[in-house]
């Protein structure tokens, strides 16, 4: 059986008011509650991007409730992509500015920003219209809060608590403008304290690996799910 998680506030799903402004952390707790209440026996968790952060939180904070984790193109601290020496403290001002800009921008500017962002995240032009529609159908405050949370949450100190196997699938494309070895080093360094980990690179893909290289991604998932 497969459980598909739809996060409130994204892609047309009604938003949930959260005074703390967190999205990933309460989602992880809600999934942990779901696993308990549905009496699921340590499911396999696959998460992409924000979902990858949620999967890491589940593995670190509820290690007995999951069997394995697949993290798809996500780091335990998002801001490392922009600054390898970043800390939560140094990331906060930039994250706040980005959040405030998202909240303040008029609709036309928001659409232009999302369109430009998606062009960097999906190499497949055919995949972009649906991604844009999902982005524009998302609650703006939820998106802004999630972005701030991702940019200021450093899960590296928690990685040592993950007791189950972890596979990190990450994208690479020459259009990134940096050598593949640099991207690999970024991921390996970020996950250095994760006990049982392996990495898989999928080439000729941007961030939305499952859309840019669907066959390669499907194979990676199938291999991962083998007992």
Regions found by a protein language model. Name each.
Residues 4-46, 60:
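Active-site loop/oxyanion-hole signature of alpha/beta-hydrolase fold enzymes
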Residues 7-10, 74, 171-173, 204:
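Active-site loop/turn elements of alpha/beta-hydrolase fold enzymes
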Residues 41-83:
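Conserved hydrolase catalytic core segment
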Residues 67-105:
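Flexible "cap/lid" loop of the alpha/beta hydrolase fold
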Residues 105-178:
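Alpha/beta-hydrolase
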Residues 202-214, 218:
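Catalytic histidine-centered segment of alpha/beta-hydrolase-like enzymes
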């Amino acid at each position: 059986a497969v459980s598909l998680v739809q996060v409130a506030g994204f892609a047309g799903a009604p938003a949930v008011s959260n005074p703390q402004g967190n999205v990933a952390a309460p989602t992880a707790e809600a999934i942990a509650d779901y696993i308990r209440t549905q009496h699921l026996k340590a499911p396999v968790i696959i998460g992409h991007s924000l979902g990858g952060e949620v999967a890491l939180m589940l593995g670190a904070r509820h290690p007995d409730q999951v069997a394995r984790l697949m993290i798809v193109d996500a780091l335990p601290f998002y801001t490392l992509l922009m600054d390898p020496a970043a800390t939560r403290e140094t990331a906060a001002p930039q994250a706040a500015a980005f959040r405030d800009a998202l909240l303040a921008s008029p609709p036309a500017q928001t659409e232009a920003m999302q369109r430009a962002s998606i062009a960097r995240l999906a190499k497949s032009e055919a995949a972009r219209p649906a991604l844009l529609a999902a982005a524009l159908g998302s609650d703006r405050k939820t998106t802004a809060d999630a972005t701030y949370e991702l940019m200021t949450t450093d899960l590296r100190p928690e990685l040592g608590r993950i007791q189950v196997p972890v596979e990190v699938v990450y994208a690479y494309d020459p259009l990134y403008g940096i050598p593949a070895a640099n991207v690999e080093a970024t991921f390996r360094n970020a996950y250095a304290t994760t006990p049982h980990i392996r990495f898989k690179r999928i080439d000729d893909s941007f961030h939305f690996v499952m859309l840019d290289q669907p066959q390669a991604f499907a194979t990676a998932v199938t291999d991962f799910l083998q007992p």
